[in-house]
């Protein structure tokens, strides 16, 4: 009898978890176009992720010496290209002459927006890379924010979800004041907890991108009660993807989009995953 009760309890628990997983949707998006599988932040990477079924992307934007917006993560060129020096002190033409370490070309915002503009069901995080802060004094920061916002919104498909994100909260505050209603996300290198939730609320943003290690299900539930949308990072492995889903994240980045999608389809078909 005890054994039968245990089996029934286990079945009921599994059914409960499965029902919850089916009700909860997690959107997985391609971080820098899937930097561990493809040539990060290049048009080739975004196309490869799109071809794999992804409609969610994260991109990093910096300002060149002559005022153009380039898609790149680091403030320096050495890690990802055959060039050297600081992005913000290099002209767009100089950057266009470089090759990435995988033989590609650096992407610029206009070509990315042109590629996105006819696509349906997009979710794109435009991360404002305005650190080191000495490269972006207030006047330069405002020029950067205005140009980025205006270019992105002028080319936004009607059904797209475009979000401006940053770990430099100066840009978030400026956009919020200048463009009321803009969709903003605070990025933090700390886990989701009481302090980071309070910080997001104080900034007046509706989204928080928190580090997954140290984040609990209770913290995610509290953030949801506070009206916050939760995005978790990093996404290096399929285990990271599973942890993000377990924690109850709304969004989750991944550096391995193809591997994660294959894993989810084959191993966790009960999860309600959107790409």
Predicted regions: what is each one?
Residues 1-24:
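Bacterial Sec-dependent N-terminal signal peptides
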């Amino acid at each position: 009898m005890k054994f039968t009760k245990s089996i029934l309890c286990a079945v009921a628990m599994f059914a409960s978890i499965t029902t919850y997983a089916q009700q909860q949707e997690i959107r997985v998006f391609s971080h820098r176009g899937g930097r561990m599988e493809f040539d990060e932040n290049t048009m080739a990477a975004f196309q490869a992720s799109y071809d794999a079924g992804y409609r969610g992307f994260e991109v990093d934007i910096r300002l060149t010496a002559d005022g153009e917006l380039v898609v790149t993560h680091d403030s320096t060129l050495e890690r990802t290209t055959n060039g050297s020096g600081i992005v913000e002190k290099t002209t767009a033409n100089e950057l266009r002459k470089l090759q990435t370490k995988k033989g590609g070309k650096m992407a610029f915002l206009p070509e990315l927006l042109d590629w996105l503009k006819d696509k349906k069901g997009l979710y794109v995080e435009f991360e404002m890379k305005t650190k080191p802060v000495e490269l972006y004094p207030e006047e330069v920061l405002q020029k950067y924010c205005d140009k980025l916002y205006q270019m992105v919104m002028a080319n936004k498909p009607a059904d797209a979800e475009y979000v401006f994100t940053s770990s430099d909260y100066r840009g978030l505050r400026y956009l919020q004041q200048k463009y009321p209603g803009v969709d903003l996300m605070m990025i933090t290198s700390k886990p989701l907890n009481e302090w980071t939730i309070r910080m997001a609320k104080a900034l007046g943003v509706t989204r928080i991108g928190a580090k997954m290690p140290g984040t609990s299900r209770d913290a995610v539930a509290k953030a949801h009660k506070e009206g916050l949308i939760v995005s978790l990072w990093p996404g290096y492995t399929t285990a990271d993807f599973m942890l993000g889903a377990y924690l109850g994240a709304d969004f989750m980045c991944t550096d391995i989009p193809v591997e994660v999608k294959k894993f989810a389809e084959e191993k966790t078909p009960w999860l309600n995953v959107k790409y």
